Amino acid sequence: MIISENNRREICKYLFKEGVCFAKKDFNLPKHPLIDVPNLQVIKLMQSFKSKEYVRETFAWMHYYWFLTNEGIEFLRTYLNLPSDVVPATLKKSAKPGGRPFGGPPGDRQRGPPRSDGDRPRFGDRDGYRGGPRGGDEKGGAPADFQPSFQGGGGRPGFGRGAGGYSAAAPSGSGFP
């Protein structure tokens, strides 16, 4: 596609300044939202840059996203005649706010929510977590005379690897009755 030199330069300036570019996948959009050129020209120029590995492309939710690579930075520096100390915004270090560092002196601030002395136990209402009475009483469970029995052979055939399936007898010599 033939793209005018002015439009090509505008797209390249924006891409180098930000380090990233996006475009909605709408080939009939008359103008890109951030650059004063047709959206189709942005998409086609970025496709060309992608084939030359100047940008890396991601597509999500009907939008293209292009990220400038190191080769692309070098190419755009020469194309736009920029000095080597000028870098895209994605490579600039962000200024950290001058706040307190993590940690600090231990008695400097109160940790956790404010507490009043002795109004609740240390672990809250978790005392009864395991349930049941806390004495040496008889524990709940099966009675002492409980004899569990499992149906084998009689009744219904086993399930899965249970009793051989389809009420078949155990193979002879297997050691099973």
UniProtKB/Swiss-Prot annotation:
A GO cellular component annotation here is:
cytosol
Q: Where is the composition biased (Gly residues)?
A: 151-165
Molecular function terms from GO: mRNA binding; structural constituent of ribosome
Organism domain of life: Eukaryota
Q: Where in the cell is it found?
A: Cytoplasm
Which residue windows does the record flag with biased composition (Basic and acidic residues)?
A: 108-140
Bias type Low complexity, positions = 141-150, 166-177
Record carries keyword Ribonucleoprotein: yes
Question: Annotated region Disordered: where?
Answer: 90-177
UniProt keyword Ribosomal protein present: yes
Q: Which UniProt keywords apply?
A: Cytoplasm, Ribonucleoprotein, Ribosomal protein
**Family to which the UniProt record says this protein belongs:** Belongs to the eukaryotic ribosomal protein eS10 family.
> Mind telling me what this protein is named?
Small ribosomal subunit protein eS10z
Q: Which gene encodes it?
A: RPS10A
